[in-house]
Amino acid sequence: PLGALPVDQLINYNSTTWFFRLKGTDLYYFPGVYPKVASEIPFIYQGRKAYMQDAEAPFEIPVSKASDNRSVVSVKASLDGTKMNISRRVVYSGEQKMFGQSVCSPEVSLYGPDHLEAYWRYLKYDDSDPYCVFPKKDASNIKAAFAEYKQKEQADQFKEEVTGYHESDPVKVSGYGVDCVGIRKDSADLVYHVDYEMEGLVKRAGSSMMLAVGKLIGEQMKLEGNDRIRKDRIWRKMAFADEWNIEVALPKGYQASAESLKKLNTTVSNDCGEFAVKASAGAGKIIVHVSKSFLHREEPVANWDKVLKLVDACSAFNEKQVVITKK
């Protein structure tokens, strides 16, 4: 497990984790930590030293790349006075799928109704009811519990997801759903959507409006004071790449200030990753594409200033606004 001694320094087999490798391939199968494609390696095992029973020499378990662990967020928004109606679709791949589990299953369970139905389809059982694999009484109880979860707890989970994304409660959540749980190779991404209304992202300034477009990528890490000083190597769960595709429909008779749009455009790139923003307007819409990547799971402390530049660029964009004026 994460934080344990290297396997060649252990004195107790209870501290080991057993896994399988499909012979002649680079496919590894570890104990599951949440529902996923079976051959996806949990981050807690990546990069660790391991032994196979048919070999004497140890080897290093493969480490995923940033391109393996992606999130793609599509935001479509419209303005209603100072309120904003938002439809957000989230696609997670690789180990980033762990971040979507909070809206997929009850708090007391590793899997939810969407997982059960997806596994049922994957295993191609003939019977159409996925609950028939359980004893009749258990099936009835599980079915009732999952129905209650979808009606009550999942609604709260999606509301909490919105609150976590914006660090502010939504006015209301009008729709949500899990579109794909990501358990099979031909549909490996975890996908969900949520529709809601927010206040505080649009403010009036006379006849104009100020749109907090930077907040549409969710709250970003900001490092201040002593947090900007580091003496140890940098370690994160995984290398990753995030992407946001934002589209904001403007009210009739309004346009985005070309100058404020231009100020959104930025690119910060170095050996550790990249943060880039490209903004434009047309056909009554503001279109913003944002990308962020951290390319390595570990960085030497010598690269801390480079990492800081990326973190600062992300947090600076969080504060960006677009001026919307009457035509």
Give the predicted meaning of each segment:
Residues 1-327:
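A sensor for short, sequence-defined functional sites
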